[in-house]
Amino acid sequence: MIMAENELKSKILPFVLHNAISFSGKVNPKASMGFVLKHLPELRKDAKLVLAAVGGIVESEISGKSVDDLKARLVEVAPDFEAQLNASKKEEVKGPLKPLRGAEKGKLCVRIAPSPSGPLHIGHAYGSLLNFMYAQMYGGEFILRIEDTNPSNIYSPAYDLILDDVKWLTNGKVVNCVVQSERLETYYKYGRDLIDSGDSYVCDCDSDNWREMKAKKAACSCRDLEIVDQQTRWDKMFIPVVDGGYSEGDVVVRLKTDIAHKNPAMRDFSLFRINDHAHPKASGATRVWPLMIMSVAIDDTLLGITHVLNGKDHLDNGRKETLILEKLGLRVPLYQHWGRINFEGFALSTSKTRIAIEQGEYTGWDDIRLATLRTLRRRGYQVGAFSKFAAAIGLSPNDKTVSWDEFWKMVNSFNKEIVEPLANRYFFVEDPVEINVEGMSSHDVSLAMHPDFVDRGNR
């Protein structure tokens, strides 16, 4: 939802006046806009409108005015502005990562959002730790959100496995775990709001035909039905088939966007669908499920997420979520993305691994041949080694390919740095054989537990 012109001008006026006063009444509109966006980062998506509003303010409020006039005007429109500006100056933050755009000490809230298809693996460690380390740097909140709104792809033990993995990654500091299947009524509420406002519609078109129409940038007939008809269709989605409701696959709810958008993925994308597959945490009557794009958008704003840190493969998702939130008039978080990391030579598919475990190829999720976090924990790897790996890569937009050998060389080096001063020296000889050595006198040998810490005693 784009802010009204007068509302926008009122919001940015104190910042433009302050900027003009700082430069003796002279204003560079683009520089002034930069000052505005620095303090109001939520307006970045409307930068063109902000620049136009700055130009209007310069013409109506600043041109021809003395610095004293500008100071008087600033006191008139925002008496406490200077004090608020000083109070809002961000405390310098130090940590293993570069400062995060738009983040404030004590106000940052980030999340990770795995699906319960299996435990976490190496691929999850980077993103999870990046988010967690930023939360620690800024004294903010870190949320684990389990996204389980696809009943067809749920491995029931994964709920506990994931929580256990994240507790290990965060040294037990995760206290807020949200499960999306427990929030369905919230998603339904906002789904109905979009129907009632005419911003979405229930589409019963054949999926193949609809894809052809989308490719041609043509709207289907469902789009133009009256709101009352859309409401009837929405209600019918919740009715069991035996009572006259839709069958699975009959309809989907779509957001009304630009059907001619240059990016086909942005054209009237789906928000809800019917899935009658049994869900381990929902009642048997539950059949309407939000697609990830809908539930994620709603949760990110309602849970107070300030920054969504994700891979570049989620760029379109961020744009879609922004459209949903703007139509609902809800706060939009800041989206930042890291480059794709291709872990070359890693078998990370949880579905394939699950089958292999069931067939006895692996002993379990902590089989030492796997790349799960449970395996790494069992092998003695320290969380700090993976934190150092995440910090070394950082929130970089560049794509990377990391080979099996390259990854382990880096992680093993980091792990050794951590373990080296902690590990006592022991030795072990399997199936020892006693031998006699001639020509040597007998004497006792005593070796320290650790050569650098003799106070630990001897072996």
What does each of the following model-derived ranges do?
Residues 2-222, 313-347, 354-361:
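N-terminal Rossmann-like or analogous alpha/beta NTP/dinucleotide-binding catalytic cores
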Residues 20-36, 40-47, 366-457:
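Extended, domain-scale alpha-helical bundle/helix-rich regions
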Residues 103, 195, 241-242, 357, ...:
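Hydrophobic residues in alpha-helical segments
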Residues 110-117, 143-149, 301-309, 367-373, ...:
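Glycine- and acidic
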Residues 113-115, 193, 265, 355-358, ...:
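Preference for short coil/turn "hinge" residues that link or interrupt alpha-helices
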Residues 114, 119-125, 156, 160, ...:
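Conserved structured core elements
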Residues 135, 200, 295-297, 376, ...:
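Conserved catalytic-core segments centered on acid/base and nucleophilic motifs
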Residues 197-353, 361-364, 372, 411-420, ...:
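Active-site cores that bind ATP or allylic diphosphates and position pyrophosphate for catalysis
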